[in-house]
C-alpha cells in the first residue's frame, strides 16, 4: 500500500473516539475509519432501526457549499438536471450529477439556503464530484466543509425522538430543513435522505 493510501484511510470523523469507546468495529470506508457494526451485531441493530430509530455517523460524506447569488449558482443546472429557481429556501432535491456525455456520474442532494446552495456528496466520489462542479462554478465560490459532522437518524420513531431533543423538528416536511439550536450550538436539520 502506498504512503498516500495509508494516509487517506487514517481519516476519522469527530465521533471516531465515541465509536471505539462503545465497541464499534472500525473498518476503512471512503478513506475514513468508520464503524461497520457494534457488539450486539448487525441483525439486532437492523431490527432496532426498523422498529424504533438508529443514529448513523455519515460525516465522511461531502458537505459542500456554493456561495453567491442565484445568477452565480445557476450554471450548476448544466450538470445537475433540476430547476434550481423553483427551490424554496431550505428545500432539498435528490438529483444526479451528469458527466460530459449526459450520463450519470453520481447522485446527490442539493438544498437551497440563504446565500447559496448546500450539497451532500457521496463519500467515495466527493473529490471527483467537486472537480466536476468546478467546471461550471467558480471554485472561489465553493467550500468543502471538513469541520462539520453529519448525523442521520432513521426509523419510524426518528421524528418523535428528535422532536423531544430539538422541539420543532416535527414541523419539517419531507425534503425541507431549518436552523435549530442544540446545547447553544447552531445546527441545521433536514427531513431528507435515502438509503
Spell out what each predicted region is.
Residues 1-195:
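Basic, glycine/lysine-rich polyanion-binding surfaces/domains
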Amino acid at each position: 500500500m502506498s504512503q498516500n493510501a495509508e494516509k487517506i484511510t487514517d481519516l476519522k470523523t469527530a465521533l471516531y473516539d465515541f465509536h471505539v469507546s462503545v465497541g464499534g468495529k472500525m473498518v476503512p470506508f471512503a478513506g475514513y475509519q468508520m464503524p461497520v457494526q457494534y457488539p450486539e451485531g448487525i441483525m439486532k441493530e437492523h431490527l432496532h432501526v426498523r422498529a424504533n430509530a438508529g443514529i448513523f455517523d455519515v460525516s465522511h460524506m461531502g458537505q459542500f457549499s456554493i456561495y453567491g447569488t442565484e445568477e452565480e449558482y445557476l450554471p450548476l443546472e448544466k450538470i445537475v438536471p433540476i430547476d434550481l429557481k423553483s427551490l424554496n429556501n431550505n428545500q432539498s432535491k435528490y438529483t444526479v450529477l451528469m458527466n460530459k456525455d449526459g450520463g450519470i456520474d453520481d447522485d446527490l442532494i442539493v438544498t437551497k439556503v440563504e446565500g447559496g446552495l448546500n450539497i451532500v456528496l457521496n463519500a467515495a466520489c466527493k473529490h471527483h464530484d467537486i472537480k466536476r462542479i468546478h467546471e461550471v462554478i467558480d471554485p472561489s465560490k465553493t467550500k468543502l466543509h471538513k469541520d462539520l459532522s453529519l448525523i442521520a437518524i432513521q426509523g419510524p420513531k426518528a421524528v418523535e425522538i428528535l422532536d423531544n431533543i430539538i422541539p420543532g423538528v416535527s414541523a419539517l416536511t419531507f425534503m425541507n430543513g431549518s436552523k435549530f439550536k442544540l446545547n447553544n450550538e447552531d445546527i441545521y436539520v433536514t427531513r431528507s435522505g435515502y438509503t
